Regions:
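Structured adenosyl-cofactor binding patch, chiefly the S-adenosyl-L-methionine
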Residues: 226-268
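Active-site/ligand-binding-proximal alpha/beta "capping" segment
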Residues: 186-223, 227-229, 237-240
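Glycine/charged-rich beta-loop-alpha catalytic/anionic-binding loops adjacent to active sites
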Residues: 38-40, 97-101, 212-215, 233-242
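RNA substrate-binding interface of SAM-dependent RNA methyltransferases
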Residues: 2, 87, 93-190
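Fold-independent oxyanion-binding glycine-rich loops
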Residues: 30-31, 42-43, 65, 106, ...
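N-terminal positively charged helical leader segments and presequences
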Residues: 1-91
Length: 268
């Protein structure tokens, strides 16, 4: 029996838990992963050496953001590069069966950071920030690019922390009309409204038990303007209310995501 067989013979059979025994989990880009080796460079190398203070023979759980996870042992660490030996590879079924896209109006302050982090933890598939007519923060293209870089990093870190194997994409900020024009494969398109005269969430869940692709929109602090609601309805979005109480914009997305995952997804 070779080393790989010895290692694999002692792994738990449940693929959800194969690599959770490793004390540290990191993301490594697929281009730095070969059949038998993983290479660490730059900031990630610095983190492993100086922050985590790991040494040769220590083991790590590594994910590549494309659905694969690895158990790896450190072979060498220098100030310039690190090398890990792959001891096992798996494709654990940790992603939600739902393909959820969140269209989130730009909120004030740093609330978008929080929304992205928690939405990723709750299993969102993709995030689409947008400007609405009542959006308060506005920024230029240069500022927008910096924000997207930070938000994508937040998505990566939230995936790493929560055990996800994919990293949700945070798309560039667009105007509301541009968002509505985006092609979508979602079988359900929802615009969340505080007006309880719109469709109820309970009825929505009852009549859509078998739907898997969902695209939902959350407005800014002041809510959607009437003309925006009309535009969304013209593009096939259905209005749904979360009840009588008024929720903050950063609460709405997380509430709806939690309910979707519990009722239709994998939150058991």
């Amino acid at each position: 029996m070779n080393t790989r067989e010895v290692f694999n013979s002692h792994l738990p059979r449940n693929p959800n838990h194969i690599f959770t025994s490793a004390p540290h989990r990191i993301f490594v880009s697929p281009e730095n992963i070969s059949k038998e080796r993983i290479i660490l460079l730059g900031e990630l190398l610095k983190k492993v050496r100086l922050v985590l203070r790991l040494k040769p023979k220590d083991t790590l759980s590594v994910f590549d953001g494309t659905g694969f996870e690895y158990r790896a042992q450190i072979v060498s660490l220098t100030p310039h590069a690190g090398e890990l030996k792959i001891m096992g590879k798996t494709h654990p079924p940790r992603e939600s069966p739902l393909e959820i896209h969140l269209g989130q109006a730009m909120p004030k302050s740093q609330k978008m950071d929080f929304i992205i982090q928690k939405a990723v933890e709750l299993g969102v598939g993709e995030i689409h920030p947008f400007f609405s007519s009542r959006t308060i923060p506005r920024f230029n293209l240069s500022q927008a690019m910096k924000k997207i870089e930070r938000w994508q990093k937040i998505s990566q870190e939230a995936s790493q922390q929560s055990g996800r194997i994919n990293i949700p994409t945070v798309n560039p900020v667009v105007e509301f009309v541009e968002l509505l024009a985006l092609p979508s494969q979602a079988s359900l398109k929802i615009i969340l409204q505080k007006d309880s005269s719109h469709g109820s969430l309970k009825n929505f869940l009852t009549t859509n038990q078998n739907k898997r692709g969902i695209f939902f929109l959350v407005g800014p602090e002041g809510g959607f303007a009437p003309e925006e609601i009309t535009r969304a309805l013209d593009h096939g979005f259905k209005p749904i209310s979360l009840g009588e109480r008024i929720l903050r914009t950063e609460t709405v997305a997380l509430t709806f995501l939690s309910i979707l995952q519990y009722e239709l997804g994998d939150m058991t």
